[in-house]
């Protein structure tokens, strides 16, 4: 997992093909920038955020 600056820039680049925008993640994960909203301590396995939103079932 590569660190990213979503919290600062709202965007990160995970490898050559994956980009995450309008996101509040603090780390990029292998599953193309899965991330948690700032109110979530962690995301459930397989959770993928679209934009800066994430289903409540993702948040743990």
Swiss-Prot record:
The lineage of its organism: Eukaryota, Metazoa, Chordata, Craniata, Vertebrata. A divalent metal cation 3 binds at residues 14, 18, 23, 28. InterPro entries: Metalthion_dom_sf, Metalthion_dom_sf_vert, Metalthion_vert, Metalthion_vert_metal_BS. A divalent metal cation 7 binds at residues 49, 54, 58-59. A divalent metal cation 2 binds at residues 6, 12, 14, 25. A divalent metal cation 1 binds at residues 4, 6, 20, 23. Transmembrane segments: none annotated. PROSITE patterns: METALLOTHIONEIN_VRT. This is Metallothionein. Keywords: Metal-binding, Metal-thiolate cluster. Gene3D superfamilies: Metallothionein Isoform II (4.10.10.10). The keyword Metal-binding applies. A divalent metal cation 4 binds at residues 32-33, 43, 47. A divalent metal cation 5 binds at residues 33, 35-36, 49. Residues 29-60 are annotated as: Alpha. Metallothioneins have a high content of cysteine residues that bind various heavy metals. Residues 1-28 are annotated as: Beta. A divalent metal cation 6 binds at residues 36, 40, 43, 59. Pfam families: Metallothio. Belongs to the metallothionein superfamily. Type 1 family. One of its GO terms (molecular function) is metal ion binding. Class I metallothioneins contain 2 metal-binding domains: four divalent ions are chelated within cluster A of the alpha domain and are coordinated via cysteinyl thiolate bridges to 11 cysteine ligands. Cluster B, the corresponding region within the beta domain, can ligate three divalent ions to 9 cysteines.
């Amino acid at each position: 997992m590569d660190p990213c600056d979503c919290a600062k820039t709202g965007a990160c680049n995970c490898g050559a093909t994956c980009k995450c925008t309008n996101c509040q993640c603090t780390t990029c994960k292998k599953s193309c920038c899965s991330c948690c909203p700032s109110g979530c301590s962690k995301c459930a396995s397989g959770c993928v955020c679209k934009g800066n939103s994430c289903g409540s079932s993702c948040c743990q």
